[in-house]
Amino acid sequence: KVIVFKFFKPLEKIFAYNRMRRDSWLAKQADKIPDGSKILDIGAGGCPHREKFNHCEYHTQDFVQLSDAQIQNQEGYGKIDFVSDVLEIPVSDESYDVILCTEVIEHVPDPISTIKEISRILKPGGTLLITAPLQSGLHQEPYHFYGGYTKYWYKKFLTENNFSDLNIEANGTLHTTYFALGSTIFKSFLEVLVEKKNLLHKIVALISL
């Protein structure tokens, strides 16, 4: 698998298209946020977007604390500030200028109540940066509850929870979705070939003993 990873690393923009495009979009949004703004990254995990918001007062929330090993692997990223249920984040009403919630709501049992909680802690006129897959395979099991969110879902439930000025963008097209699926299958096929080659080498080595 290491060989396959090294082979695909130069092609990351192709084989990780959705993530790369999403990260690029988030970086552009982060540049629009005024210096010193208070931001809460909900479901922050390993805090992969922390550096994008170095100009902000950046806080994090998740339902578990990072282990010491995870923190070390994240190049010194700090521990999670608020370890809590996403429906009961221990902060005051209207506490934050910006809420970041990326690739999270498909992993919570009650996404509509999650939006309501986000609305509670976001200041009037604040900004919500939210992303979620329209479709995806199972991942982070057993915490994968929903398969995807349409623009109609966002329009209905964000509007019902006091959000306005919605700007909903698709991350790619139907063609890029098929391409991403095909590239994933191709990559998995190469990984299987590498594993079989390694197994063959082991068999030959045993026969040679």
Indicate where each model-derived feature is located.
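A structural signal for short coil/turn segments at secondary-structure junctions
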Residues: 33-34, 53, 161
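Conserved SAM-binding loop
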Residues: 28, 37-140, 152-155
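Class I SAM-dependent methyltransferase Rossmann-like catalytic core
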Residues: 1-33
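A short linear-motif detector with a strong N-terminal bias
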Residues: 17-21, 36-41, 61, 77-78, ...
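Polar low-complexity intrinsically disordered regions
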Residues: 1-2, 55, 203
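S-adenosyl-L-methionine-dependent methyltransferase catalytic module, highlighting the catalytic core
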Residues: 12, 16, 83, 111-117, ...
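Solvent-exposed, charged interface segments at domain starts and junctions
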Residues: 1-10, 38, 151-157
